[in-house]
A protein has these predicted regions:
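Gram-negative bacterial Sec-dependent N-terminal signal peptides
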Residues: 1-27
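Outer-membrane beta-barrel porins/channels
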Residues: 27-44, 48, 98-100, 104-109, ...
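Transmembrane beta-strand segments of Gram-negative outer membrane beta-barrel proteins
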Residues: 32-47, 66-85
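Residue-level detector of alpha-helical secondary structure
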Residues: 42, 57-64, 74, 479
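Surface-exposed strand-loop-strand hairpins of Gram-negative outer-membrane beta-barrel proteins
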Residues: 45-54, 83-125
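Outer-membrane beta-barrel pore proteins
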Residues: 50-52, 58-71, 134-139, 153
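Short glycine-rich, polar/acidic loop-and-turn segments at beta strand-coil junctions
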Residues: 64, 72, 77-83, 88-90, ...
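Generic, well-ordered alpha-helical segments
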Residues: 67, 74, 79-83, 122-126, ...
Length: 484
């Protein structure tokens, strides 16, 4: 290949990845997001990034880059559609069916409470998720990789008005977008090591109604001295926080035979303290409970008297929350049966037990701390490629993913449970453009029914849910890979 032609093809490859990095990222379904291209989705992630010339190794297992024999740029766009429905009941702190007492613009309560009888509508979402990888061999021993990935992301959106879920969750969104650089070294012809760094931008958004009168009725500060009703008015709290953090990852790859490849990878836990702002969109009654100092309460607001040390500002204040990215360990195996059929299997352990609670702080004080007590999980996957013709490759796979949630602390923000993935995919080499391959995949998620026995913290009003969420999801993935 002459130098001019090489430079042109290199420019095309860089443009593919550069165009992706310059685009906006979007939220995908699930707290933990698979970081593969369409070929990986088609195999349900079986074999990880150990298949021949898979550029997703740049993030998933950088050691595998040492066995990639050409420059590769890859762009994937995923379309995710997640559906969630709640069915069940909600109760106030007394155990009565949940209600709300409307108030007018002057803070005057209505004549009667209104039942909260809505089930929150459709809690799911649709989204587009771009992912990109690039691998460049430096010589016969070293290779360098770049990627843009979304390792963490989840979203739920429930109705606010008349909803049984309004005191537990309205909108929730967590997204982490990372840019990575990695390097691999082939120690021997059958063994390689690799490692890399990730710089990630995390954003979090949560909102829910604050049941201030219910919280006052349960408060230690007032000691039950006043018989407050539950659910008076509307006080929608919105919290938006973000952070930039740095982490690292590493991996090893061993080829014990000319047909087998084994890989082990580790992605370290990343400390992630997010900071931002909160606002409370309160009616006249709620605003008064947060701002008006009452002589009979020691010249404190109702909120301050109910929970000493707690201050809420309806016009907003600074906020912070810590949501660390858990460590993972992945073990992958790929076996080449013949020149047409290749099979892969994987296991992924995630240290979700590091996520114990979600604590919101402001100006040195804890507004609320919600326990989650997640447990460590395993994901098992099996998938493969069948080269149907010299240009067409067919793929299929199945995976089982354990949930980190517990029945005792699961809530509508993340109503997760164990799930199965089933996937189909294809790859086609474009004859008119040598080096260009188009891949596609369809993946369906079957999620076990999630029970919700959530009890709110006292300072959130002490409401209780008794119901279940049924969820299902599907992902359509399309990618372009250019080798040069």
């Amino acid at each position: 290949m002459n130098n001019k032609k090489y430079k042109l093809q290199a420019a095309i490859g860089l443009a593919v990845l550069g165009g992706l990095i310059g685009s906006g990222s979007v939220q995908a379904g699930g707290f933990s997001t698979p970081t593969y291209g369409a070929p990986g989705w088609g195999r349900a992630f079986g074999g990880g990034s150990l298949f021949k010339n898979d550029p997703s190794a740049a993030f998933n297992n950088p050691a595998a880059m040492a066995f990639i024999d050409r420059n590769i740029a890859h762009l994937t766009v995923d379309y995710a559609r997640i559906k969630m429905k709640y069915k069940g009941n909600a109760y106030d702190f007394r155990g009565d069916p949940a209600t709300t007492l409307p108030v007018d613009g002057d803070g005057n309560p209505g004549d009667a409470s209104v039942p909260l009888d809505g089930n929150g509508g459709q809690g799911g979402f649709t989204a587009w998720l771009p992912t990109g990888f690039m691998v460049m061999p430096i010589n016969d021993r070293f290779a360098f990789g770049l990627s843009q990935v979304v390792p963490m992301g989840m979203r739920s959106t429930w109705d606010q008005n008349g909803s049984k879920l309004r005191d537990f969750a309205v909108d929730t969104k967590i997204e982490t977008v990372g840019l990575t650089g990695s390097l691999s070294y082939k120690v021997r012809d059958d063994f390689a090591v690799g490692g890399g760094l990730i710089v990630q931008r995390s954003q979090g958004f949560v909102s829910q109604n604050l049941n201030l009168t219910g919280a006052a009725a349960l408060s230690p500060g007032l000691g039950g001295a006043i018989d407050f009703p539950s659910g008076v008015g509307s006080n929608l709290m919105r919290v938006k926080v973000d952070n930039t953090s740095v982490g690292w990852f590493t991996g090893v790859v061993w080829k014990p035979t000319d047909r087998d490849t084994l890989g082990l990878n580790y992605h370290a836990k990343i400390k992630n303290k997010m900071e931002g702002h909160y606002n409370i969109y309160a009616d006249a009654t709620g605003r008064g409970q947060m701002t008006v100092k009452l002589p009979n309460l020691g010249n404190k607001t109702l909120v301050e008297a109910a929970y000493p040390g707690l201050k809420l500002f309806p016009d907003g204040a600074k906020a912070s929350a810590e949501l660390d990215i858990p460590a993972t360990v992945g073990l992958d195996w790929v076996h080449v049966f013949d020149d047409r059929f290749t099979m892969g299997a994987s296991m992924l352990w995630t240290q979700w037990s590091s996520f114990k609670d979600l604590t919101l702080k402001s100006q040195g004080n804890t507004i609320v701390s919600i326990p989650y007590k997640y447990k460590d999980t395993m994901m098992y996957s099996l998938g493969g490629d069948y080269r149907f013709t010299d240009r067409l490759t067919l793929r299929a796979g199945v995976a089982f993913d354990e949930t980190p949630t517990r029945d005792s602390t699961r809530d509508p923000r993340i109503p997760d449970n164990d799930r199965w993935f089933t996937s189909l995919g294809f790859g086609y080499d474009i004859k008119a453009i040598p080096g260009l391959t188009i891949d596609g995949a369809y993946s369906r998620q079957f999620v076990k029914e999630a029970k919700l026995k959530t009890v709110n913290q006292d300072r959130l009003g002490g409401s209780r849910l008794d119901g279940k969420v049924n969820a299902k999801g599907e992902v359509v993935s399309l990618s372009a890979t250019y080798s040069f």
